Each structure stands twice: as structure tokens, then as C-alpha cells.
């Protein structure tokens, strides 16, 4: 197998190469007709670690906008809440404190799940009315994601959204390659919630509300030019948003650490980000106003960005693939969806499958060991075996979610209608399987398994119970169909 698993390109044949010992192109020559068994030596492909050129952090880091080179015409991308909270005014104050005069426009109509129409509308304004040299995205993941695609469509109007949403397995070898950005404008991302990590990643999630699809768009050209991680701006997060965003960051760290793209450069970021979230999320949400809570909020803000740096190069997995799908179809907050699914995915990936995914640099399935390492890093009992460590970690995540944060245990508790949920189970399985995050999962996610997990997560029961419920439902449907035919 070639691509990320081996530097040898596949021959796509089972001819004499297979007879010689394997099916790669380096084993299909005349010499291989002799009955000598040869096996290609495994060579790992080059990997990468890519982040914005500049990342500024610590309280009041937005002051960098006063000195940043080349800001004369700026567009501020946000939502209405950022204006109401006065955060946009703080950005404007920094621009007005510059030595040169800055003209600016505000795009304040980004919705919680930014749509294709919204990004196209914003890009059209930039092209036709203003032509900014700087795009400043301020807010949660939605304004930052929207600004990335606006940036792309502003600089390259010839590109259509249908092109950039094309799937790929290896980001370096995709059918459609996004051209470089930054010739017309720089993108500055300023997060005000501590979760998405979008300020340092090459990802943007855009929703097609006509079809209900959430598209995770991925290309390193979309990596912001500058990230400003100012914890002061995150102090206004409502309690529920802080919980959801924090669990999103925790899921980023977990999935980056067990991803098939995980590497020495991302592992440190992922583990430390997970530890920071574990130690500080509850205090940042529940703590009384004061020095301890302020410190916890600062650590959470840093953790979210560090987790973003990890998954920006290691990618995510099936938890996010399912969360994108269920969130779009059921209108459940992304972080809340992740918090509901994460324990199920830990147990699913933590059990050794009959046919495990091949891992780069590894010759056996090691997800259980990786979860055990996460547990040990968090101070959770790692158990005597990897299997014990997996179960202890899943239970600890459930306990943290349920008891320390008081979050919903199931999608039913989130208010999702039961009949509607059953009507979309097939869509959930198929769309999650097709999601761009799924290929990096350590265990190849099967559609039927994801249906079972989705059903289990609706009722808050085990995956095994979810499987039984699905089989019973299928039997009832078959009986009803037979009766109608009779």
C-alpha cells in the first residue's frame, strides 16, 4: 500500500508483482519472473507540521493590531453577538490607535453554522465594494471558518465552492488544489471562545442548508496569516458555551493523538492540550470570579489553540465525522455533540478490530495503548492493560461531562425528536462515513457501527444496546412492509 503508509507508489495491479511478493510497482520487472520472493521495504512518506507564521498570546495580545505591518483597509468578520458584547469595538480601538489611518467595513451576519450563501456574499462585498488588504475574523469557530472561505473566494473568484469541498485521503494528493492565498489580503484570526482552534488550522466547516450537509474544507492555503490568542476576550463566554467549546478542544486533542497522521511534532501539543483542558475546564466554567478562574480561562484559551496546532497536522477522526453530521441534521451545538459521542468513540477505537487500519510507522494496532497513554497523562488510572486504560478513560470522560460540567448525557436529553432521529439514522451513518475526518481515524469506521453508536448516543446506552435497538427496528420495519404487501 502506498500513499501515507509507504513511499512506494502503488502499481494498481495484482500481476507478476503479486507473484513476486507484493503488488507495488518496484516488484513487476523481468527479474521478478524468477521464483524469488521479494517484499518491498517499508519507507514512511514525508509528513509536515504547519501553523500560522505568527501566533501572539497572553492578556491584551490584541494590541499587536496597532503595530502589524500593512493594515490600511480592513474587513472585520464577526456575528451580531460580538458587536453586542463590545468586542468588535475593542478591535476598532486598536485599529484607530495605529499611526496610519485605517478604513474598515464590518461583516456581522455570520450565522452559527456559516452557510455557502454567507461566505459567497461576504466575498462578493470584498471584491466589488471594498478590496481589503486585511481580513480580521473575531469570534468563535463560525466567523473564523467563514472568513477563510471568504478570503479564498475574494482572492480567487474563479473558484467555486463545489471545487473546494472535494474529498481526499492525503492532503498533498487531492484532485483539486487550492492556490496560494495572501497576495491581496492577510487573514488575522482572533478567537473569543476556547474550543475550535480554527485560528491556527487549515480547516473550515461550511454548511449547505439546502442539503443539510456540513463540509469540512481542508487545505493548508487556508491557514491564517496571524493568530491572536487573547484570553481577555474569552472571559465573556456563557457557561454553556464554555463547556461545549472546552469539550471540543478536548476531543481535538484526543483525536489528534490517536490519528493515523499523529507524529512526534503533534503528540506533544495534543497531550499537553488535553492536560490543560482536563485541569482547567471545570474551574473556568464553574469557578467563582477571581484569580483562579481567570487563570483557568487563560489556560483553556491556550489549550484550545495548542489542540488546534496538533489536529491541524494530525487531523481528526470519526467522533468529529459523526459530530458534523448529527450537528447539521439535528441542530445540536458542535461541542455538545462531541461530548456525547467521545466516550463511545474511545471504546470503539480502543477495541482491537479483526482487520485494523494500517498505521504509518507502526506494524500493529496501537490505539488502545495511545488511549492508555492519554489516561496516564491526565492522572486517570491507566490500568494494568491497555483495555483497562481505555475503559477507565471513557468512564472518566463521562464522569467529567456529567458531574463536573452537568452536560447532557444523550441526544434525547438535548431535545432531539425521537421519530425524526430514527428517520435520519441511515443518513447519519452514510454522511459520517463520507466525512473528511473519517479517513484519519485509527480504526476504519464502518457505516453500521456508526449507526449503532448514533442510536446508543441518542438514548445514553452502550453501543451493544444501540445495535440491538437497530436490529429490532429493522425487524419491525420489515414486518410492517410485509403486512402492507399482503
Where in the sequence are the language-model features?
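Glycine/threonine-rich beta-strand-loop-alpha-helix active-site module
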Residues: 117-232
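C-terminal segments
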Residues: 1-46
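Carboxylate- and glycine-rich phosphate/diphosphate-binding segment that chelates Mg2+/Mn2+
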Residues: 200-314
Amino acid at each position: 500500500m502506498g500513499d501515507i503508509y509507504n513511499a512506494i507508489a502503488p502499481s494498481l495491479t495484482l500481476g507478476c508483482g503479486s507473484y513476486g511478493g507484493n503488488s507495488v510497482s518496484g516488484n513487476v520487472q523481468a527479474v521478478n519472473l524468477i521464483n524469488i520472493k521479494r517484499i518491498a521495504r517499508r519507507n514512511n512518506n514525508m509528513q509536515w507540521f504547519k501553523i500560522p507564521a505568527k501566533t501572539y498570546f497572553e492578556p491584551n495580545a490584541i494590541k499587536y493590531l496597532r503595530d502589524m505591518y500593512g493594515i490600511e483597509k480592513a474587513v472585520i468578520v464577526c456575528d451580531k453577538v460580538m458587536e453586542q458584547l463590545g468586542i468588535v469595538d475593542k478591535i476598532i480601538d486598536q485599529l484607530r490607535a495605529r499611526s496610519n489611518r485605517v478604513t474598515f467595513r464590518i461583516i456581522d451576519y455570520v450565522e452559527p453554522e456559516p452557510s455557502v450563501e454567507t461566505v459567497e456574499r461576504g466575498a462578493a462585498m470584498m471584491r466589488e465594494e471594498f478590496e481589503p488588504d486585511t481580513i480580521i475574523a473575531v469570534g468563535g469557530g463560525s466567523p473564523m471558518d467563514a472568513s477563510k472561505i471568504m478570503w479564498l473566494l475574494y482572492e480567487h473568484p474563479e473558484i467555486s465552492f463545489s471545487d473546494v469541498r472535494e474529498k481526499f485521503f492525503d492532503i498533498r494528493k487531492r484532485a483539486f488544489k487550492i492556490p496560494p492565498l495572501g497576495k491581496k489580503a492577510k487573514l488575522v484570526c482572533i478567537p473569543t471562545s476556547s474550543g475550535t482552534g480554527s485560528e491556527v488550522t487549515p480547516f473550515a466547516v461550511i454548511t449547505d442548508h439546502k442539503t443539510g450537509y456540513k463540509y469540512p474544507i481542508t487545505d493548508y492555503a487556508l491557514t491564517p496569516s496571524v493568530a491572536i490568542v487573547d484570553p481577555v476576550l474569552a472571559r465573556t463566554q456563557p457557561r454553556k458555551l464554555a463547556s461545549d467549546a472546552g469539550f471540543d478542544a478536548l476531543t481535538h486533542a484526543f483525536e489528534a493523538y490517536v490519528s493515523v497522521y499523529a507524529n512526534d511534532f503533534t503528540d506533544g501539543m495534543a497531550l499537553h492540550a488535553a492536560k490543560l483542558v482536563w485541569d482547567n475546564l471545570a474551574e473556568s466554567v464553574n469557578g467563582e470570579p477571581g484569580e483562579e478562574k481567570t487563570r483557568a480561562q487563560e489556560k483553556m484559551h491556550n489549550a484550545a489553540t495548542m489542540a488546534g496546532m496538533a489536529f491541524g497536522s494530525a487531523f481528526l477522526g470519526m467522533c468529529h465525522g459523526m459530530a458534523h453530521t448529527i450537528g447539521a441534521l439535528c441542530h445540536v451545538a458542535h461541542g455538545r455533540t462531541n461530548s456525547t459521542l467521545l466516550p463511545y468513540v474511545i471504546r470503539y477505537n480502543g477495541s482491537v478490530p479483526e482487520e485494523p487500519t494500517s498505521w504509518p510507522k507502526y506494524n500493529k494496532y496501537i490505539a488502545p495503548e495511545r488511549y492508555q497513554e492519554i489516561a496516564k497523562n491526565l492522572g486517570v488510572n491507566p490500568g494494568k492493560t491497555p483495555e483497562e486504560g481505555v475503559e477507565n478513560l471513557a468512564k472518566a470522560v463521562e464522569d467529567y461531562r456529567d458531574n463536573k460540567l452537568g452536560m447532557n448525557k444523550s441526544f434525547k436529553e438535548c431535545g432531539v425528536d425521537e421519530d425524526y432521529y430514527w428517520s435520519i439514522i441511515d443518513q447519519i451513518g452514510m454522511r459520517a462515513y463520507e466525512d473528511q475526518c473519517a479517513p484519519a481515524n485509527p480504526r476504519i469506521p464502518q457505516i453500521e457501527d456508526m449507526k449503532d453508536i448514533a442510536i446508543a448516543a441518542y438514548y445514553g446506552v452502550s453501543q451493544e444496546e444501540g445495535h440491538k435497538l437497530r436490529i429490532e427496528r429493522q425487524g419491525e420495519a420489515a414486518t410492517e412492509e410485509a403486512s402492507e404487501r399482503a
